[in-house]
Regions:
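Specific aromatic-rich, kink-prone transmembrane helix
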Residues: 419-450, 468, 663-667
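Juxtamembrane segments of multi-pass membrane glycosylation machinery
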Residues: 313, 319-362, 381-382, 589-598
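Interfacial juxtamembrane loops and adjacent helix segments
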Residues: 267, 271, 283-334, 399, ...
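Transmembrane-helix motifs of polytopic, lipid-linked glycan transferases
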Residues: 354-384, 427
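Perimembrane helix-loop-helix junctions
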Residues: 480-522
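Membrane-interface alpha helices of multi-pass inner-membrane proteins
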Residues: 426, 449-475, 482-486
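Hydrophobic, aromatic-rich transmembrane alpha-helices
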Residues: 581, 588-629
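Start-transfer (signal-anchor) and selected internal transmembrane alpha helices
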Residues: 1-43, 196-272, 391, 508-520, ...
Length: 753
């Protein structure tokens, strides 16, 4: 019988549990301390440096250069950019200046007056108070650094300008610009500020490092899609983007107004294109109810750029940019299915149009969900005994590679077909990958089997085919995903052929699976072809040749000399860095001849370097993939075809990377799993983790340990590039133009240091 002393001894599992809790608590406290130190000390260094500032000022108003005049409302107007400055004196007790601006009420009133003046003069372009003000502070004759500020981003009002003497703050704006600046103050104290958005960003980075580091417990948990606990965890994780994107959807539904822009003598930019399509469908007509100028209707060849320019010069308006004009009517050449599924129901229920940005967010959220499911299913098929840590890294890398960040950032009608097709294709392939299931069917007739090949679920085959065929009404290039059915179901196709030759399978039985794929596809594609036929007299004519765009699209083709460059830029366009926020810039992409080009910050293999493992797939022949190699190689082949197609037909466009990025990310999965796990073990996860010990590091080989750090850092790199790319000033729909307050708020985190 054990003694009392022996009874009091804690068991070894209890001791280990307590040690884990202590380690977790220490790590948590260390993370909190690190974040607090960064926030209170590093990011608030300007506060600590200016505690001794004199705060003296030598005048109520600054001396203005002769290139500035003060308006009645207190703002400034630039009359001569070469002499547009404010002059004051600094005593050297503070390295910072503060530029004061007028109140939001005064600025908003001036903008309203400018807009009213523009409308009263046939949308004539007029000057409005600037939202982004470019300034440069020179101290005692020493040229300072140029930077920008925003009236609503208070922290951006502080400008670093060390030294003493005469200070000139140059307003670097064009003649006639209205600058909502009143005065500037030297010798100021920078206030202490805790920015909770910055704190959250640091916490998220530390959290990702904690859960993905090689010693994380997630490396010791086997991925098990059938586990209820893991399914609930997956739902919980997806609740985060659902909540964030859901808030954005509600905001867009509540606040977004009609996005129509027109300047006299120029094209009309109407971003409610899908709303107009919904109105046309509800009214039962194929064309859009938009006015057609008489001069345009009388023009024989309206697609010629010079002809359109002459029409604009003669006052013909409106000419809608990126709308298709054909046979006296305006049309949309973008896929109609999103309008049918989202915009028309909302129009009928709410009585007004669904904001395009809200529809984009809905589709991207669905894409995130379905593509994550697809990637997890591929991971489990390729390496069933991998870890949760490896799977989560691969999912995040794949989402970024598939242009999730770009689609979330740009929410106009151009991205709607891409987001819709990514959603439908992800769901369709997920259903197809799950079609060879051993689960008991609801009805025996739902299963189809040929020879010794795995049985197939006919409902999943049919629903998958329905989704993939629906791409014909979204982004037609995604219909090439149907080709992936052949390598995926090749064992069944081969068994079917053998069965028919040996007459072991009856013809009617043999047709069940093919018909389960063909019939849904026909049901979807037939009305879409009819829609094209009614509008443009051909089932395969989507109307893109009739768009009013950069060239005469009825004749334009990408120059053959540009093809090699386009392909190279899509895959390997280098990143371009600079020494100031956001440290990332648009990367130049010179062409031998003129062609369409959208500014890009990088390419699939440079912005998301883990996708390079897709190129290693043909070399990893000895890696066990459980029969998935032909399918994954086909993904790589289809991606190559689409890169060439987009280079030829579309030119160089960032959004076109969404055509093939998801395919390359799928093809990279085996290589990524091999990097972090090694060759697949025959029996347990311990082999994949190199017999990891209790802390997950001690018995992991140094090479594998290093690779896990490399993969984790590469994922963080890709996320960082995706986030910083949102702040690039030269990109389309730049944040500094569309949301200057947010841009300058984030910029001010770093410019004062």
């Amino acid at each position: 019988m054990p003694s009392n002393h022996e009874r009091r001894l804690p068991s070894r599992p209890d001791t280990r549990h307590r040690l884990r809790l202590v380690r977790l608590l220490i790590a948590l406290l260390a993370a909190i301390a690190a974040i607090a130190a960064m926030e209170c000390i590093v990011f608030n260094l300007p506060f600590w440096r200016t505690l001794g500032a004199s705060t003296d000022t030598n005048a109520v108003h600054n001396t203005l250069g002769s290139g500035l005049t003060r308006r009645n409302d207190g703002m400034l107007t630039v009359t001569d950019p070469t002499k547009a400055y404010l002059e004051l004196t600094a005593d050297g007790t503070s390295d910072y200046l503060r530029i004061d601006t007028e109140s939001s009420k005064v600025i908003d009133k001036a903008r309203e007056q400018a807009e009213a003046e523009s409308k009263a003069n046939d949308d004539k372009e007029v000057f409005k108070p600037l939202a982004t003000i470019h300034v440069r502070a020179d101290v005692d004759g020493i040229t300072g650094k140029a930077q920008s500020m925003n009236p609503d981003a208070i922290r951006s009002h502080y400008v670093k300008a060390p030294g003493a003497g005469i200070v000139r703050i140059w307003i670097q704006e064009e003649r006639g610009a209205i600058v909502p600046v009143t005065d500037a103050r030297a010798n100021v104290r920078v206030p202490f500020v805790i920015n909770w958005m910055r704190v959250l960003a640091m916490a998220l980075v530390l959290l990702m490092i904690a859960v993905w580091r090689p010693g994380s417990c997630l490396w010791r948990i086997t991925l098990d899609p059938s586990s209820t606990r893991q399914r609930l965890a997956f739902v919980g994780l997806l609740a985060i983007p659902t909540l964030l994107i859901g808030v954005s959807i509600i905001h867009e539904l509540w606040y977004t107004s009609s996005l129509v822009f027109h300047v006299s003598g120029d094209y009309t930019y109407d971003f409610d294109q899908y709303g107009h399509v919904a109105d046309a469908l509800v009214a039962g007509r194929p064309w859009l109810d938009l006015p057609v100028p008489e001069q345009l209707a009388a023009t024989e060849h309206p697609y010629d750029v010079a002809t359109r320019a002459q029409l604009l010069a003669n006052g013909a308006s409106p000419l809608y940019w990126d709308y298709a004009y054909y046979d006296g009517h305006w049309y949309s050449y973008f896929g109609v299915l999103p309008a049918v599924l989202l915009f028309v129901p909302y129009r009928l229920l709410a009585g007004h149009n669904l904001p395009t940005s809200a529809a984009e967010y809905i589709l991207v959220l669905l894409f995130i969900i379905f593509f994550s499911l697809l990637v997890l299913r591929v991971i489990h098929r390729v390496m069933p005994k991998t870890s949760v840590a490896a799977a989560s890294l691969v999912v995040v890398s794949s989402l970024v590679s598939a242009q999730m960040g770009y689609l979330l950032y740009r929410t106009n009608f151009y991205q709607i077909p891409f987001a819709a097709s990514l959603t439908l294709t992800s769901l369709g392939l997920w259903l197809w990958l799950g079609a060879d299931t051993s689960r008991r069917p609801l009805r025996p007739s739902d299963r189809w089997q040929a020879g010794d090949a795995k049985p197939l679920s006919l409902p999943r085959l049919a629903l998958g085919a329905l989704c993939i065929a629906a791409n014909f009404g979204c982004r037609p290039t995604f219909t090439l995903a149907a080709l992936l059915a052949f390598p995926l179901f090749w064992p069944q196709i081969r068994a079917l052929g053998t069965g028919l030759r040996t007459r072991r399978i009856k013809p009617l039985q043999a047709l069940r699976a093919p018909l389960a794929v063909i019939i849904p596809a026909i049901l979807v594609v037939t009305p879409l072809m009819a829609w094209n036929m009614v509008r443009f007299d051909s089932p395969f004519n989507f109307g893109n040749a009739y768009q009013f765009s950069i060239s005469d699209m009825t004749r334009y083709t990408t120059p053959s000399a540009d093809m090699p460059a386009n392909i190279w830029y899509y895959l390997f366009l280098p990143l371009r860095f600079m020494d100031r926020f956001p440290w990332l810039a648009g990367s130049p992409a010179p062409m031998p001849q003129w062609g369409y080009y959208e500014v890009m910050v990088g390419a699939i293999f440079t912005a998301t370097p883990l996708t390079l493992m897709a190129l290693a797939l043909p070399l990893l022949r000895r890696l066990e993939t459980h029969g998935m190699r032909p399918w994954l190689m086909s993904c790589l082949a289809v991606a190559a075809v689409l890169v060439v197609f987009d280079s030829r037909v579309g030119g160089l466009g960032w959004r076109y990377s969404a055509d093939f990025g998801w395919l390359i990310s799928l093809a990279s999965i085996p290589g990524l799993l091999w990097l972090v796990n090694g060759r697949e073990p025959s029996r347990s996860l311990a082999g994949a983790n190199d017999a990891a010990s209790g802390d997950g590091i001690a018995r992991v080989t140094p090479w594998r340990w290093l690779m896990r750090w490399v993969v984790m850092l590469a994922v963080l790199w890709a996320l960082g590039i995706a986030i910083l790319s949102c702040f690039v000033q030269s990109r389309s729909d730049s944040m500094i133009a569309n949301n200057p307050t947010l841009w300058h708020q984030v910029q001010s985190w770093f410019t004062l240091l």
